[in-house]
A protein has these predicted regions:
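Hydrophobic alpha-helical scaffolding
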Residues: 16-23, 58-62, 82-85, 106, ...
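Short, hinge-like loop/turn segments at secondary-structure boundaries
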Residues: 58-61, 99, 121-124, 223-227, ...
Length: 438
């Protein structure tokens, strides 16, 4: 069950006393099921108290349930399947060939790419759109303090990266009757998705990126060690840009005055967002860095770090710092961390347990008041508190960075964070809503 207690899950590598079903009981249950006539056992770990084992997020290693599934196999004569991040073709094939399991259980990867098996069969592994284990589209049931549990705004069983899943008619791509010249400003995920969709419909697409690399802020988002699937997704998008007839203009910083010179029938602006700036004393000191600067490794941190902001990015940065052996304090002005709607409880629960396991200090209802060279001052219910540190990482959100305003007469469309800051699902689904039939 991977339980330390009621509503207490164990994380990989943690030593603990099993509170729920242990291996011995699992053997007994498996034999009972076999005797009752079951044809196959689909084995994984977890309970609702350790939900992240049954629905593993990106913080969980690939094939996380394979050791326990293979343990069960010798005790029954019926086939044993293993589920839980088993989508790596080589890893799955090896587990089958070596007799550890009899079958592989895969669900989310098929939502993300329905041609998953066909691409493996055709030896086109690089063409597979990878599931990043975000749960934002398929299982976004969320909970946090003040919100005991709620359903996401979209139905379950969808995919953040592939809006076509269960919406084939709504998002059916057809060849355009009239070919248009399309200019896409910004080479992040939103810009690349828009360029991809417009090219697939037969339009002539030019993509303008101000830097020398595609990816935008997602390059930083994919940087932590546990985001290997994010990096694979970024590579997938770059490969799609190469495969499709899209002209990419690198180091082209398009200004509003240049839009009329592009000769485009439609202009899609996907210029992203910029970090929010806190107007507090000491915020401009050299040891204070933005989240994106930390993730891009533009600046290193010391050994004693305060992370400001307990949203998803701030918590992931705190975890990433802890993995490096840093002493981390996480401060959040709200009464709970990870107060993010549609963030699956599987993801948030595991991240909370990782923060606990790595002894990351968490201060709630603790707004940042000032920064000094060797400490920060936060607010508390009783007044103020000084926290010693040698580095401060700010993760306090973003503000839209719209190049221009949307203009239907000039056929200018805003897409993604430059219009409204959101997550990966928000920008990809918005791209489909905008581009299909444009």
């Amino acid at each position: 069950s991977k339980m330390r207690g009621f509503q207490q899950g164990a994380v990989p590598g943690e030593e603990y006393e099993e509170f729920g079903r242990d291996k011995e009981e699992a053997i007994k249950v498996a034999k009972i099921l076999e005797e009752a006539g079951c044809d196959l056992l689909n084995a994984d770990n977890g309970t609702y108290d350790a939900w992240f084992w049954a629905h593993p997020p990106m913080y969980m290693p690939l094939a996380c349930n394979l050791p326990e599934a293979s343990f069960l196999k010798p005790h029954v004569s019926i086939p044993v399947a293993c589920a839980g991040r088993m989508e790596d073709p080589d890893q799955a094939a090896e587990a089958l060939a070596e007799g550890h399991i009899d079958a592989v259980g895969i669900a989310r990867q098929f939502l993300c790419d329905g041609l998953y098996l066909d691409k493996i069969r055709d030896e086109k592994i690089g063409d597979i759109r990878p599931c990043i284990a975000c749960h934002n589209g398929c299982f976004g049931v969320y909970r946090y303090k003040g919100e005991p549990g709620n359903l996401p705004k979209t139905p379950l069983g969808r995919c953040a990266l592939n809006p076509v899943t269960f919406q084939e008619e709504k998002y059916c791509l057809k060849q355009a009757e009239q070919k248009k010249k399309i200019a896409v400003i910004g080479g992040g995920i939103g810009g690349m998705e828009a360029a991809r969709l417009m090219a697939l419909q037969g339009h002539e697409v030019d993509l303008y990126e101000k830097s020398d690399e595609l990816g935008g802020v997602f390059i930083a988002a994919a940087a932590p060690s546990f985001k290997e699937k994010d990096r694979m997704l970024l590579l997938w998008y770059k490969n799609e840009m190469k495969k499709l007839p899209i002209t990419i203009h690198f180091e082209e910083d398009v200004s509003p005055s240049m839009l009329d010179t592009l000769g485009a029938d439609e202009i899609i602006v996907a210029t992203g967002a910029t970090p929010r700036v806190l107007p507090i004393p000491g915020i401009d000191l050299p040891h204070v860095i933005e989240a994106i600067e930390y993730l891009n490794k533009d600046q290193t941190t010391g050994l004693n770090v305060v992370v400001v902001g307990g949203g998803l990015t701030g918590c992931e940065i705190a975890y990433d710092l802890a993995l490096q052996g840093k002493k981390v304090t996480l401060v959040e002005m709200l009464d709970d961390i990870l107060k993010v709607k549609d963030l699956s409880a599987a993801n948030s629960n595991m991240l909370r347990e990782l923060i606990r396991y790595h002894a990351i200090d968490v201060g709630l209802e603790a707004p940042l008041l000032s920064v000094a060279p060797d400490h920060v001052v936060i607010g508390t219910k009783d007044g103020e508190k000084i926290i010693s540190c040698d580095s401060v990482v700010l993760s306090v959100g973003y503000t839209p960075n719209a190049l221009v305003s949307a203009d239907s007469k000039q056929r200018i469309h805003l897409l993604g964070d430059c219009e409204q800051v959101g997550n990966l699902k928000d920008v990809i689904w918005a791209a489909y809503d905008l581009c299909v039939g444009l």
